[in-house]
């Protein structure tokens, strides 16, 4: 959705990075202005991120915005009883079952990968502020890094799970500190914290709340039913 919006609104080049090349190709093919360029890569790998940044740098002298939009749920709480308070034994056995690697995967994708995505593109973002060919010169809009976290990062309830909520809270605070730390470099850092929004990841949650009884477009595009967004 973000890539298509940038394409539709006149972005010269929109690079999208993901592990599934066929999905990237589908997005690129659907672009109105055909400015979306797919790159297969894994944002949880420094080597892969570095290779993607190097490829983009070889094709364009600068970028104006980098968006970190990947996400992972980690172990969820969906297997615990919903109609009663689970016993402490049930809680222990359920929470102890997933491996620490599964738990850490959410932090790798939602927090660490977000950070290294910014770092990988710092030289190109800096060039976006300085290149004579950059629209920054005429518009005055500085280079930007935007991350997607979650409204769950502010919640006292675990939501999709402790790994997910904790990793999103970490991402939110990291962007807050980066927003301050990047001031001398004129690189803006912001985080978007969506509520429940229709996507492959949220499909289970939407179904659980019986949202599917109403067409999602009717529900989410009407302000009275909107789950909202939070910006920082």
Language-model region placement:
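N-terminal Rossmann-fold cofactor-binding loop
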Residues: 17-22, 43
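Canonical Rossmann dinucleotide-binding motif of NAD(H)/NADP(H)-dependent dehydrogenases/reductases
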Residues: 1-15
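Catalytic loop of short-chain dehydrogenase/reductase
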Residues: 72, 77-107, 112-115, 119-184, ...
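A glycine-rich helix->loop->beta "capping" turn
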Residues: 33-37, 54-68, 73-79, 99, ...
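A conserved hydrophobic alpha-helix of the Rossmann-fold in NAD(P)-dependent oxidoreductases
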Residues: 24, 49-53, 202
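Rossmann-fold cofactor-recognition segment
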Residues: 31-47
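C-terminal helical subdomain
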Residues: 191, 208-232
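Short, flexible catalytic-loop segment of classical short-chain dehydrogenase/reductase
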Residues: 193-204
């Amino acid at each position: 959705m973000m890539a298509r919006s940038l394409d539709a609104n006149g972005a010269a080049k929109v690079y999208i990075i993901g592990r599934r090349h066929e999905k990237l190709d589908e997005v690129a093919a659907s672009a109105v202005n055909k400015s979306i360029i797919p790159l297969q890569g894994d944002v949880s790998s420094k080597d892969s991120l570095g290779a993607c940044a190097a490829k983009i740098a070889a094709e364009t002298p600068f970028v104006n915005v980098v968006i970190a939009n990947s996400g992972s749920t980690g172990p969820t709480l969906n297997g615990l009883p919903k109609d009663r308070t689970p016993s402490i034994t049930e809680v222990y056995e359920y929470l102890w079952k997933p491996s620490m690697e599964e738990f850490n995967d959410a932090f790798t994708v939602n927090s660490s990968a977000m950070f290294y995505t910014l770092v990988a593109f710092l030289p190109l973002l800096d060039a976006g502020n300085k290149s004579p060919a950059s629209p920054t010169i005429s518009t005055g809009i500085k280079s930007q890094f935007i991350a997607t976290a979650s409204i769950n990062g502010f919640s006292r309830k675990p939501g999709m799970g402790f790994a997910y909520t904790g990793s999103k809270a970490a991402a939110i605070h990291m962007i807050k500190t980066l927003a301050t730390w990047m001031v001398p470099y004129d690189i803006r850092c912001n985080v978007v914290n969506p509520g429940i929004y229709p996507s492959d990841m949220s499909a289970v949650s939407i179904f659980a709340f019986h949202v599917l009884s109403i067409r999602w477009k009717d529900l989410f595009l009407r302000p009275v039913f909107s789950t909202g967004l939070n910006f920082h």
